[in-house]
Amino acid sequence: MLLRILTFLAVCQVTTSHKILMFSPTASKSHMISQGRIADELANAGHEVVNFEPDFLNLTDKFVPCKKCRRWPVTGLNNYKFKKIQNGLSGDVFQQSSIWSKIFNTDSDPYQDEYTNMCEEMVTNKELIEKLKKEKFDAYFGEQIHLCGMGLAHLIGIKHRFWIASCTMSVSMRDSLGIPTPSSLIPFMSTLDATPAPFWQRAKNFVLQMAHIRDEYRDVVLTNDMFKKNFGSDFPCVEFLAKTSDLIFVSTDELLEIQAPTLSNVVHIGGLGLSSEGGGLDEKFVKIMEKGKGVILFSLGTIANTTNLPPTIMENLMKITQKFKDYEFIIKVDKFDRRSFDLAEGLSNVLVVDWVPQTAVLAHPRLKAFITHAGYNSLMESAYAGVPVILIPFMFDQPRNGRSVERKGWGILRDRFQLIKDPDAIEGAIKEILVNPTYQEKANRLKKLMRSKPQSASERLVKMTNWVLENDGVEELQYEGKHMDFFTFYNLDIIITAASIPVLIFIVLRISNISIITSSPKNKKD
């Protein structure tokens, strides 16, 4: 018996358990999935994880984001306007806007405004705040989408904060942290511009980055004003709370990123949970995966609702499938999109579904390509499975994700408007993926690199979290640049002074010259 006890103790990892608050509003299923993976990994490591779920889209009773955490839904929020804005995103992506409208648009962001309104409704709920305080959380985890959670963490007395980038870090997040974002190398997240780029594209990229920082600053000011109004003028700036987080976890993989400057306390954890996910396929999917020369999967994620997209898109897509009758197509649409189901009637090589076991389908050896919106969860799953992709970005970070994939050679990038105006371009991309083995070779290499890393995403997350909490923070990793103002950080005061000196010299010489001329003997005689 003693030998058994000693053996058991030998194989157990001694870890101090901490109570962690995971701030995970139901603003998007894909974000809830990403947050849920982090929560489960921390719970598996022995921590008590509470998944705090303000119900922005009435999803808490319809979707389970984590298996090992304790869920804490917050229902009854006034979310009507937020849901309306979210549902309208799909239709808005096909409204073209010029660069000038983005630069000179000083209107408020309805999405962020409603997020702030629901945040205020929640943090001013005294009963809820008291319950949260009694939990005595050791750490807070929250995304970059909105800084409500940072203010909440401070309000309930959480000392250690971990800031999560749910996708590639935006220029505004990088700016908050004091990380340079070279506009000559890194394309603005919502454009398809290539880099390195000619002069005018770099100029456009730079101006769009500055406009984005301006817009994000406006949203931060709005959130700050809300907290100060309710909790006093000495309430700290939520951006300061965010940028002084102990660690920044980025839910991406460095191998998929456009390489850029970074910091020692920025840790990539892309790929969490992928090795344990996948599972089996039910009979319906097993049958279709065995048909024809292979299978092509089409999905635009959870935000781009196919019901609200222009009808021409699905019509053109169905026509494209008939150009490849030797291949089977699995097309995932919104469950209310009855029109797409009707369009597929009579097409023997097309299966339209409102749900697909995506990781399992991607892992199947007969899947030939994935037509995707370039959302980061989908890209991670594709890369981990070694599947070439055709990227049709719609919004947010998706265009930059697509550009990164194209640059690394395992996918083909297309413009979303080609779904309407130039379906031949989509057809051509499918042909290229099927006949050119280079894309599969690049995807296989990426798969090998991701799976053979010296340290897994799970190990990075757990070990770095434990390291911070067991040492009561790691101030030594805090970057001094994040405390500097804009002028000092970029040495603008020095540049302006240096640029002013020649001008001052010119003015002095000019005045001196005029003075000499006017005081000459000839002028005196006159």
Curated annotation (Swiss-Prot):
For this protein, the parts annotated as crossing the membrane are 489-509
Keyword set includes Transferase: yes
SUPFAM superfamilies found in the cross-reference section:
UDP-Glycosyltransferase/glycogen phosphorylase
Disulfide topology = none
Q: Per its UniProt entry, what is the enzyme's top EC class, as one word?
A: transferase
> A single GO CC term, please?
membrane
- MF term (GO), any: glucuronosyltransferase activity
Q: How does it sit in the membrane?
A: Single-pass membrane protein
Q: Which domain of life is it from?
A: Eukaryota
* Coiled coil start-end: none
Enumerate the subcellular locations listed in this protein's record, separating them with semicolons: Membrane
Oxidoreductase found in the keyword field: no
The alphabetized UniProt keywords are: Calmodulin-binding, Glycoprotein, Glycosyltransferase, Membrane, Signal, Transferase, Transmembrane, Transmembrane helix
Reactions catalysed according to its record: glucuronate acceptor + UDP-alpha-D-glucuronate = acceptor beta-D-glucuronoside + UDP + H(+)
Which InterPro entries does the record cross-reference, listed alphabetically? UDP-glycosyltransferase (IPR050271), UDP_glucos_trans (IPR002213), UDP_glycos_trans_CS (IPR035595)
Q: What is its EC number?
A: 2.4.1.17
- At which residues is glycosylation annotated? N58, N305, N513
Q: Where is the signal peptide?
A: 1-17
Under Pfam families, the record lists:
UDPGT
Q: Where does the UniProt entry say this protein principally localizes?
A: membrane
User: What family is it from?
Assistant: Belongs to the UDP-glycosyltransferase family.
Assembly description:
Interacts with cmd-1 in the presence of Ca(2+).
**Name this protein carries in UniProt:** Putative UDP-glucuronosyltransferase ugt-48
Query: What species is this protein from?
Result: Caenorhabditis elegans
